[in-house]
Curated annotation (Swiss-Prot):
Matches recorded under PANTHER family: LARGE RIBOSOMAL SUBUNIT PROTEIN BL17M, RIBOSOMAL PROTEIN L17
Keyword Ligase: no
Keywords, alphabetical: Ribonucleoprotein, Ribosomal protein
Subunit architecture: Part of the 50S ribosomal subunit. Contacts protein L32.
MF terms in GO: structural constituent of ribosome
Species of origin: Staphylococcus haemolyticus (strain JCSC1435)
Entry keyword annotation includes Ribosomal protein: yes
Membrane-spanning parts: none
Family annotation (InterPro entries): Ribosomal_bL17, Ribosomal_bL17_CS, Ribosomal_bL17_sf
Superkingdom in the source lineage: Bacteria
Protein name, per record: Large ribosomal subunit protein bL17
This protein's GO CC annotations: cytosolic large ribosomal subunit
């Protein structure tokens, strides 16, 4: 299976996909271009599958990709993106066998006309 270069070098592309994947795990919904959304979808699907496995090796593999971002919950406690992935998100998708994300087209971006989409986690 091929991949999109997204007009960047390999290290820039990897960093951008890590950032987008972490943002999607934290926010559960982000707006980006269609090409980026299609690329980050495969990264996030694999991360959620690792989260469902839940063993130590899966946690370490997911930690390689996700940024170490702290999330403030409503009850004033903090958790990292990795904890949210292996706790809340993995529990939500125990019965689902893939297809954890949805891409909704928004229309062209005003500045350059790039096709904007919203990528979100399916409930």
């Amino acid at each position: 299976m091929g991949y999109r270069k997204l007009g960047r070098t390999s290290d820039q592309r990897k960093a951008m996909l890590r950032d987008l994947a972490t943002s999607l795990i934290v926010s559960e919904r982000i707006e980006t271009t269609e090409a980026r959304a299609k690329e980050v979808r495969s990264v996030v699907e694999k991360l959620i599958t690792l989260g469902k496995k839940g063993d130590l090796a899966s946690r370490r593999n997911a930690a390689k990709t996700l940024r170490n971002v702290e999330i403030l919950n409503e009850d004033e406690t903090t958790q990292t993106a990795l904890q949210k992935l292996f706790g809340e998100i993995a529990e939500r998708y125990t019965e689902r066998q893939g297809g954890y994300t949805r891409i909704l087209k928004v229309g062209p971006r005003r500045g350059d006309g790039a096709e904007s989409v919203i990528i979100e986690l399916v409930d």
